[in-house]
Amino acid sequence: MFMKATETMICLVDGEHYLPVTRAAVETLDSMEHIDVKALIFIGGTEKLRTSSPEEYTEIMGRPVHFGDDPHRIPYKLIGELIRKYGADTVMDLSDEPVLDYSKRFRIASVVLGEGAVYRGPDFEFQPLTEYDILEKPSLKILGTGKRIGKTAVSAYAARLIHERQYNPCVVAMGRGGPEEPEIVHGDRIEITPEFLMEQSDKGVHAASDHWEDALMSRILTVGCRRCGGGMVGDVFITNMKRGAETANRLDADFVILEGSGAAIPPVKSNRHIVLVGANQPLINIKNFFGPFRIGLADLVIVTMCEEPMAGDEKVREIVDFIESINPEAEVITTVFRPKPLGEIEGKNVLFATTAPDSVKDLLVEYLESEYSCRVVGTTPHLSNRPLLQRDIERYIEDADVMLTELKAAAVDVATKDALEAGLEVIYCDNIPVVRDGAQDELDDAIISVVERAIADFNLRKTP
């Protein structure tokens, strides 16, 4: 006969309910054979509260009741501390409006999930992230608070830097168009040309997947995986990322970089985390919902796209201040992206294909023309929209000598294909995160610091 394991629980209670009603709810939970209610946390409300004495409240409720320092503020920090103290599996929310609202509940959820516990209420439940503890090498995870904020560009930059510093890394990346079985790409051995990528595309391979981009930009070993669906916290519906990590265990690499997809988080345990926040994102998505949860995971936060028209100085400052309030231990670095062609474009007429928003087109064109002495005859921001991309290519292709394209979305099956058929040279383009206020070494040193701490953590776990 199947028996449920005992679930250790903490309950959140308030002073907006009469004590006998709250006590009845707690006793209902505790009467279930698989639930053991260890303690209560008073989170606010005074309308029906007869006592503010923890001792008296504890006696009435028949179990420990904990209060925060200020009865008018949610004791977020205390909730995390008591989860650890009691080894709680679940935090049950028995509170309600007006003590809690949606934003406060998401903030509580971020704290609870960050401690690896379940956050449950009458009609909701948030589960902690799936994390398979299977890697046999030190690792870091690169994740983000959304899509199109430069995660793959930063991952490629970090991988290249980590490789240059002789840590012998590989990247395990998951994407919406990844392979059915984990796919190894020897970016360190093969020459990844436009013609080679077209051959892969003709075989049915999504040759603009993140692991191909990482291999091309960083010239290192990569493992490509797929995923479908993305939850609110970061879990996915299906993925072969676990098998991808197991593949990485067998490869000739000494350090593993796990790369997320959109706001989805790889379901593999890592030693350390780098979190990307896009300054172009709405503040509500950064400061609410599960933005704070992701920020709370970080050892290093890289804020991308910190320039007009995507984000002004005031917004960037607000984002940085919020990150530091949520995770004061994390280093925060603000950056902008600048294109870096992987081939020679000096003196050439360039058609530039990108995923960058149309609002920064003039800035990128000016940068390419001034830094690389080329002439940009046309641009398209529609790499992720095949019909519009095709339209833009047809509009500009006769004036161009070179197709300069990021390796994203339709870069191979449309941009590369059409350019090669028209007799154009195809050159792929990297995006480099450039430190906004300070020296580039600050970013490099911060990334290597995370790597060193990941290695130290891994070695400590190995020590008997």
Curated annotation (Swiss-Prot):
Its main location: cytoplasm. Transmembrane segments: none annotated. GO terms for molecular function: ATP binding; cyclic 2,3-diphosphoglycerate synthetase activity; ligase activity. GO terms for cellular component: cytoplasm. Keywords: ATP-binding, Cytoplasm, Ligase, Nucleotide-binding. It catalyses: (2R)-2,3-bisphosphoglycerate + ATP + H(+) = cyclic (2R)-2,3-bisphosphoglycerate + ADP + phosphate. Induction: Constitutively expressed. Its EC number is 6.5.1.9. Optimum pH is 6.0. It is found in: Cytoplasm. Activity decreases in response to phosphate limitation. One of its GO terms (biological process) is gluconeogenesis. It comes from the Archaea. Optimum temperature is 65 degrees Celsius. Belongs to the cyclic 2,3-diphosphoglycerate synthetase family. Catalyzes the formation of cyclic 2,3-diphosphoglycerate (cDPG) by formation of an intramolecular phosphoanhydride bond at the expense of ATP. Not able to catalyze cDPG hydrolysis. May be involved in osmotic balance. This is Cyclic 2,3-diphosphoglycerate synthetase. It comes from Methanothermobacter thermautotrophicus (strain ATCC 29096 / DSM 1053 / JCM 10044 / NBRC 100330 / Delta H). The gene is cpgS.
